Amino acid sequence: MSFISKCFICLLFSTYFLPPVNSAVLQVGFLAANDNTTELAPFIGWGQVAGALGVAWSRIVEYGLLPGYETMNLTWVLTNCREADAVGSVINYAEGHAHVVLGPPCVRPAQVAGSVAKYLDFPLILWGPPFDSSLLNQFEYPTIASTTSSTLYQATSLIRLLEYYKWTEIALIYYVARSDLIPRCTPLISDFEGLVNNNDNLTITYRRQMSVITNTSYATALRNLKELARVVIVCLESDEARRNLMISISENGMDGDEYVYIMAESRRAGFASSFWNGTDGKNDLALRAARKFLVMDNQKYNDTTTFVQEVRAAFSRPPFSCPNCTNIDPTVSQVGPLGDALLLYAYALNRSIATGNPNPTGTEFCEVAKGMEFLGFTGKVIINQNSTRTPLFVVYNLDSTDKEMIVMQITEDLDDSKDPVASSVNYYITLVATPAQIWDTWGGTVPLSTPICGFTGTDCPKSFTDQYLAIILGCTAAALVLIIAVISTIVFLVRSKRQEEERLNQLWQVHFSSLVKPPQKNTMHSSRSLQSTVTTSTKVTINSKKDTERHSFYFLNNDSVVARKHNFRATFTKNDRAMFRKMRNVDNDNLCKFIGLSLDSPTLISIWRYCSRGSLQDVIAKGSLQMDWFFKYSLMRDVADAIYYLHHSPIGPHGWLSSSTCLVDERWQVKVSFFGLSAIKQYEVKEQRDFLHTAPEHIRDTNLPITKEMDIYSFAIICSELITKKSAWDLENETFDIEELVYKIKKGGRSPPRPSLETEDEHNGSMSLLVRDCWNENPDQRPTSEQIKTLMKSMNHNRSSNLMDHVFNVLEQYASNLEDEVQARMKELTEEKKRSDVLLYRMLPKQVAEKLKLGQSVEPETFDCVTIFFSDVVSFTTLASRCTPLQVVNLLNDLYTTFDAIIEQHDVYKVETIGDGYLCVSGLPHRNGNEHAKEISSMSFSLLKAIKTFRVPHLPKERINIRVGLHTGPVVTGVVGMTMPRYCLFGDSVNTASRMESNGKPGRVHISTECMKFLTEVIGGYQTEPRGEVIVKGKGAVQTHWLLTDDEIEAKENGESI
């Protein structure tokens, strides 16, 4: 068939669905291969790619890229990569006023057609497989743009990767399996060799094109390569070739850490196809070699599945109308770049129209397209200065779990001042994994271009040791003897001195490894306090403590300790170490036991004995503890005794005394911590809150030495907290902040600020006077620790000095009052429980309610024979329409209250009311033998009798009447639901009873045949009257009966109508 006839047929089949050509129609030509060409169809076959144009046009319309074009007139020619057909098609399209031609998809037709397009100044957009560097020549092909990249870009990226790791000697192995119309490895290797020839630092030491891909041919190539290179560039065009190479690499022992194989791919698949898997049992060999491979491939795009689904859907619509075109493989097919090609033209035309040129020529189109960026079907599309897509290459390897991992990206530098294909310096590498991750399967080391001992292992240079070994050994032996003698003497002297020092310092040094963290419980904690948010009125075990900003908690030799953190490292003098030993030996009832320092911990810590009730600050802040005057006095006396001891001991004044450093043990005894440690305190920086307990003179000059008068001032602030049972200065209820308050304290004056001592609790006025004397602005006028101790002793008035005795007395009185309170509350609880039970028994059967109260499940229960009652108010809808909603509710309430009173006189269980409907049953949940039909019948007679006298309050002339239906049969019961549980009946008997009611008559009892037989044959004494057959929904014609009341029996006997 001639070319012209082929074009005519394609045009005939591709334009019938679109409107006539006019100024609002985008004319697009499309060149592809026929689906029956085996070597081309998987890549550029019409049935693989054409649907992408339908998807692309939908996106153009959705984004409003071409508002002036209402439709697209798409025509195509299946040139099968023939140069003549491609040239003829381009000429026909150009003369036919097409806007653009998408193709040709093959290199040689693109070169010929590109020359013709240059002459016609007509735009072509290439979308086929990567092409070689010839088409990048803008002078020769100024009207060609491309949404696929050139093999030169990948070759340049390979050069950049080699330069990055300083690999200079390389080998090439490649295998060509594809048609020379759409080659991949051949142009890539050609471009790569051209770049290497222009690079003085790189050398190709071995090159092999495989003609066959058997293990034997690979083994021959690998044996020759082994003596020439360790870095191998691989390009293979089939998974079989890839797998066989890997198996041969392992079988020939070339899968060691010194080898690296770089596989060049363009499938956007990386390792995803797991091409080492096969059926010959050699998967392990192939995988072992795969771990030494780096795969350079185009970056994958995430939305492939959705795009392919849209393409398949587009194939089923005109103009393609190919519902069977569904076998699309995006890793082989160029379906994505084809869709991007149409998007590129739409974006470029949009930009050209915006600049006033609605009909750009091919050259103008390419100029507009340069530098354009948009999100296409294959990810982000960037057009460089060659009107070609800038590729983003990624390098994959296998991690330690043999999972694919991206380790680096290689991108083009889009600096317009540079030629993007001139040199590898225009490409840069971005590592997306650490070097350790990249080279994990190589033992964590980057392979060398040339092994240290050469490719044959015989070129290792002799070391200095090998050349002069004898001389070295002799001199070393002599020197060694001399050195050993000198070192032995020095070691003996140093060791003796160190042992003495260690013996003395072992008293206060604690190895961090001996500290054991307690198991933690979930509890909130403060960042400053020793005490978490648990109550301070009870003893708190260390297990419930969590580390804070200043403190950590440990076990030391099974004893609970607390470690205060010091975020610095200090050098201690001999005097400092002597002071630590003295502190270690301190044993006072009101001082927290100093355990020592841990010098080998991550941060310097001082270790103290743990006090279970936290600090005074925590006790006061909690506010839940009832403290009478004696309790407060005892705590203040303990603090005063601690100050007295420190001021009369070698340790000296505290300097950091505050309510947070006064700890409380399980016996409610105050123990002052963080005393001494002057060598550490000089490096500590006080926070603003710490200055609230600091004497004014020290705030003004922090370089002043610590004095006893400072401790007296701090004691006064602590006492004010105990007296008022509030934090220092009660900042929580004040409007000023800490900085402002500290400034006022520092400023002083005639009336310096001091905490309030106002309290509603009982307190001793003498104590308030003592506190005011202790915080005197003039340090010289403050009392001494001896005077404080004497004055506080006089305040006790000869009462018991034991706080625990006082606490026990208070607890006994509290326990007595608590017992009375508990009895009263229990009585109230019992009454409430009775009321709850009454309400529950009204909602559920008693035996069911009892099970639910015990937490037991209520299993469904089957009852073989019960009698079910249904009733309904006659003409209730009409009656309700004449009433207000409130009147309807009152009416039903009065009616059902009357009914409920009647039910209580019979062995009947009320199941529920639904509007004006009433459902009852007898024989469950309490089984009553055969009495259920009798009970229901008697109740029915009573209800009919009661409604005769019932009156509607707001409609006194109206009369209420009901229909009644009864049925006897089996049911299943169960409790349904967790929220508002209901005791429900299930079974056909319920439906039958309902049908008896709905087919009954006002004022009469309509019963089923089963119920009639039970009343007349089992129980006896009841009279019924056949009604005849009634059409019952779901059952057809059913024989039913009337149950006669006493009045009806009498009327019947008198010959009156019922």
Curated annotation (Swiss-Prot):
Q: Which residues are glycosylated?
A: 36, 73, 201, 215, 277, 302, 324, 350, 386
Q: In which tissues is it expressed?
A: Expression in ASER neuron begins at an early larval stage and is maintained in the adult.
Does Zinc show up as a keyword for this record? Answer: no
Q: Which UniProt keywords apply?
A: Cell membrane, cGMP biosynthesis, Chemotaxis, Coiled coil, Glycoprotein, GTP-binding, Lyase, Membrane, Nucleotide-binding, Receptor, Signal, Transmembrane, Transmembrane helix
| Protein location | Cell membrane
Q: Which Pfam families match?
A: ANF_receptor, Guanylate_cyc, HNOBA, PK_Tyr_Ser-Thr
Record-annotated Guanylate cyclase domain positions = 867-997
**Which cellular components does GO assign to this protein?**
plasma membrane
A single Gene Ontology MF term assigned here is: ATP binding
Q: Name one GO biological process term.
A: response to lithium ion
Q: Which residues form a coiled coil?
A: 811-840
Keyword Protein biosynthesis listed? The answer is: no
Q: What's the domain of life for this entry?
A: Eukaryota
Residue ranges annotated as Extracellular topological domain:
25-470
* Broad class of the protein's primary localization: membrane
Question: Residues in domain Protein kinase?
Answer: 501-809
Q: Which reaction does it catalyse?
A: GTP = 3',5'-cyclic GMP + diphosphate
Signal peptide segment: 1-23
- Kind of enzyme, top EC level? lyase
The membrane-topology field of this record reads: Single-pass type I membrane protein
The domain-related comment in the record is: The extracellular and guanylate cyclase domains are essential for chemosensory responses. The protein kinase domain is predicted to be catalytically inactive.
Q: Record's family?
A: Belongs to the adenylyl cyclase class-4/guanylyl cyclase family.
The UniProt function text for this chain reads: Guanylate cyclase involved in the production of the second messenger cGMP. Regulates chemotaxis responses toward Li(1-), Mg(2+), Cl(1-), Br(1)- and I(1-) salt ions and methionine in ASE right (ASER) sensory neuron. May regulate ASER neuronal activity such as axon sprouting and calcium responses to changes in salt concentrations.
Indicate what this protein is called per its UniProt record: Receptor-type guanylate cyclase gcy-22
List the source organism. Caenorhabditis elegans
